[in-house]
Amino acid sequence: MLFVAGSGSVGGVRSQRVDIAVIGAGPAGAATAIQAARSGANVVVFEKAAYGRDKVCGDGLTPRAVGALNELKIPLDDAHLIRGLRMIAGKQVRELDWPTTGKFPNHGAVWPRRRLDAALMDAAVEAGAEIVYETEATPVIYDNGRVTGVETNGHRFDAGLTVIAAGAQGAVARKLGADRVPDEPFGLAIRTYAATPRHTDVHLEACLSLKDENGTAIPGYGWMFPAGDGTVNIGVGALSTMKGFKKLNLNTLLESYRHLVQDDWDLGPNLERPRAWRLPMSTQRRHGDGWVAIGDAAGLVNPMNGEGIDYGLESGMLAADLFLDDPATAPVRYDQLVGERFDAFLRTGRRFSFLIGHPWILKPGLRLSVSTNAIANITLAVMGNLVDSTTPGAAGRVMKLADKSLGLVDPILRKTRAAA
């Protein structure tokens, strides 16, 4: 049963009653707001930045993400549609189209986050949600650990469910004990934009054999994501499991990669200063009494590509649906269903990151990943976030086998990892 919105005052602090309070107005938080508000829930979203803010990101949308946007009825007229992925490992190049399945669309997209996030928040407002910009909100936690809403600027919003959608774990997550697991991997990435005549290319490009300025192989990849507007999003990402990770200079790595692709893409000068961000890949908790964490805040990022927009959209919609069905059981059911859908695949990805953190495994592994069309199609499915617990066929079988196999050697891989 949904609450009736109301207001009052407690101890001099103004209070307002809502169904759902969301902290963070990225894709995950917007998905919750849209889904819940369209069904009549009273939703308020708090975003610390201004409307139309940019969000540092690769801007690529997988077919899974496009499917979620379709479910939310978000038109992609402003996005550049993408037909597939070009994977490069050394001298080997495989250009494959996204598969045609009944589960996801056969196309992805590139949609700069400034425009994507604005479209999502506009849809949330149209659905009836309230968006409060340039405002930081913190959870209200009682002595028994229950979260009863949020507080901001002397105003308290009592909520049936508080949704943490603030991206990579920060102060809010730490307050709830939902920070990342210390011993688990995470990623760092950096990107910029450049002009290119190839901006209408219909394939994303991923260089799996990424190297630093000294020629050292890096567990991660470089990307060229054509935006269709005269520019390409160019970036690199690396995993924390690599040797010397703490000394890694992302700006230098990006420049090395840019030099590699300069001629092929006929790149113009950088259009803005390169910006970096952290990719969370685990969390100590993703729910509690009265709250759930979604998207990046829940560690829902594929360790093998750093992508999490699709998981953010899906987890955001799931949180809303479960609350609408039964507010009392929503947090526990959310944790269970997210675990059933994603945990095995993401666990395999984290274990895989320790595997390729060993240089003697990384190089032959990369060659193998695109060695044949059959294997490359499995790599395509993994890179496209098309694999989860329900995936049929070769990709699903390989990931289940990998989960079991890597589980056996995971303790050894962790103990023998090189110093970061």
Task: Give each language-model segment a name.
Residues A37-C57:
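Glycine-rich FAD pyrophosphate-binding loop
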Residues A28, Y51, Q169:
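Conserved Rossmann-like nucleotide-cofactor binding loop
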Residues A123-D263:
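Predominantly flavin-linked oxidoreductase catalytic cores and closely associated redox partners
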Residues L2-R17, D296:
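A short, basic/flexible loop-to-alpha-helix module at the beginning of a structural domain
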Residues S240-F323, A328:
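FAD/FMN-dependent oxidoreductases across multiple families
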Residues D321-A420:
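C-terminal helical "tail/cap" subdomain of flavin- and related membrane-associated enzymes
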Residues V66-A119:
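A conserved beta-strand/loop capping segment in the N-terminal third of enzymes
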Residues V18-V44:
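N-terminal Rossmann-like FAD-binding beta1-loop-alpha1 element of flavoenzymes
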